[in-house]
Curated annotation (Swiss-Prot):
Residue list for modification Phosphothreonine: 15
Subcellular location: Plastid, Chloroplast thylakoid membrane
UniProt organism field: Guizotia abyssinica
Amino-acid positions noted as binding [CaMn4O5] cluster in the UniProt annotation, renumbered to this chain: 367
NCBIfam families: psbC (TIGR01153)
Protein name: Photosystem II CP43 reaction center protein
């Protein structure tokens, strides 16, 4: 058997137990990678790697379209979205499609169109993927030099980085244009319980936008996750889109500086590790955003946040007992603190009881009842509207807690079955995926650094310890 590693090889070698397996000429002997190492076999075949990536994009878009149509087919307009296990329709609704005042779905046709467009796109991508994987040129450098590359070519790599940044910037501006010119987006803070509106008065002040980045991530500060009005969100996308596009142009026009050439590892596996690290960070940020933020992820579609459901429970029983004659301003609870209302250490009037720990919740159904010093007793006695009562009762019974087949021991409706909040699903999945991507980053970064340093050459199969051990059978 040939020695499956060589000192010349820039990439570490993975091997399969059966060295005879060949796939369309891309076998283990010629590439040093077994079939299960997937795209590693294509490291130096830019045409085939393009096919793999386009086919992968096709699978992603197909999943989006198919799942979109599945959710449309199962959607019941009379029930809230968050009761129906939906994760795609809430995103479309947040963009202002198909919904009216209060987040009520008035037209499902835009959702159907979205699904069909994604399916058609996936067919085009799928064809392109199969073409480039099976029929197209193995390498692009000769026929299409613009699309060809060598992994060690630092200038070409930063050009590719620049193109990616420009595409990301265009994506950010698509949201801006939707909010400004194409019907607007759903604003959970619109008076009377939320509505679709065009965002006209963008926040473009750098001190406000970048102030979010300088906030503490803890408690009442909440870093960028604390954003609570759409003007700031859309204005932030203007800044982000501009920075991405300008940065992309800069990376296309310039070559890496000497310090960057020295500090970074310039190989395919290194770029993979950088990408995995970035996606990991995105996953963790998305987890926090969907869990805590009810502006970017309106509760009408995703269900209440944890603090929101807790405060809604306190509010619901305050309303009930006030109707029954309780003096909610002075009633004492079992600890001697206020039963319904109390003061925070800094003097604001907040809800009493266990929900005191969520005193800094902001929610559209609650804010109208606040005064300059927290909750306003006179407003709580005179100004509570029916829609606020309905919404808080609904949120109280739909806390984002989570076991798969129960409702976690909080106040529930008599017929609440198998409710799991989309917030729970989205936050948990993004946390877990963010963690896995981080582990992938560590793995590939370690291999890339070892390969660059020249000391990872795979295992010498002639003297591998397992060869001298008794077979399992």
């Amino acid at each position: 058997m040939k020695t499956l590693y060589s000192l010349r090889r820039f990439y570490p070698v993975e091997t399969l137990f059966n060295g005879t397996l060949a796939l369309a000429g891309r076998d283990q002997e010629t590439t040093g990678f077994a079939w299960w190492a997937g795209n590693a076999r294509l490291i130096n075949l830019s045409g085939k790697l393009l096919g793999a990536h386009v086919a992968h994009a096709g699978l992603i878009v197909f999943l989006a379209g198919a799942m979109n149509l599945f959710e449309v087919a199962h959607f019941v307009p009379e029930k809230p979205m968050y009761e129906q296990g939906l994760i795609l329709l809430p995103h479309l609704a947040t963009l202002g499609w198909g919904v009216g005042p209060g987040g009520e779905v008035i037209d499902t046709f835009p959702y159907f169109v979205s699904g069909v467009l994604h399916l058609i796109s996936s067919a085009v991508l799928g064809f392109g993927g199969i073409y480039h994987a099976l029929l197209g040129p193995e390498t692009l450098e000769e026929s299409f030099p613009f699309f060809g590359y060598v992994w060690k070519d630092r200038n070409k790599m930063t050009t590719i980085l620049g193109i990616h940044l420009i595409l990301l910037g265009i994506g950010a501006f698509l949201l801006v244009f939707k909010a400004l010119y194409f019907g607007g987006v759903y604003d959970t803070w619109a008076p009377g319980g939320g509505d679709v509106r065009k965002i006209t008065n963008l926040t473009l002040s750098p001190s406000i936008i970048f102030g979010y980045l300088l906030k503490s991530p803890f408690g009442g500060e909440g870093w960028i996750v604390s954003v609570d009005d759409l003007e700031d969100i859309i204005g932030g996308h203007v800044w982000l889109g501009s920075i991405c596009i300008l940065g992309g142009i800069w990376h296309i026009l310039t070559k890496p500086f000497a310090w960057a050439r020295r500090a970074l590892v310039w190989s395919g596996e290194a770029y993979l590790s950088y990408s995995l690290a970035a996606i990991s960070v995105f996953g963790f940020i998305a987890c926090c955003f969907v869990w805590f933020n009810n502006t970017a992820y309106p509760s009408e579609f995703y269900g209440p946040t944890g603090p929101e459901a807790s405060q809604a429970q306190a509010f619901t029983f305050l309303v009930r007992d006030q109707r029954l004659g309780a003096n909610v301003g002075s009633a004492q609870g079992p600890t001697g603190l206020g039963k319904y209302l109390m003061r925070s250490p800094t003097g604001e009037v907040i809800f009493g009881g266990e929900t005191m720990r969520f005193w800094d919740l902001r929610a559209p159904w609650l804010e109208p009842l606040r005064g300059p010093n927290g909750l306003d007793l006179s407003r709580l006695k005179k100004d509570i509207q029916p829609w606020q009562e309905r919404r808080s009762a609904e949120y109280m019974t739909h806390a984002p807690l989570g076991s798969l087949n129960s409702v976690g021991g909080v106040a529930t409706e008599i017929n609440a079955v198998n409710y799991v909040s989309p917030r729970s699903w989205l936050a948990t999945s993004h946390f877990v995926l963010g963690f896995f991507f981080f582990v992938g980053h560590l793995w590939h970064a370690g291999r890339a650094r070892a390969a660059a340093a020249g000391f990872e050459k795979g295992i010498d199969r002639d003297f591998e310890p397992v060869l001298s051990m008794t077979p399992l059978n």
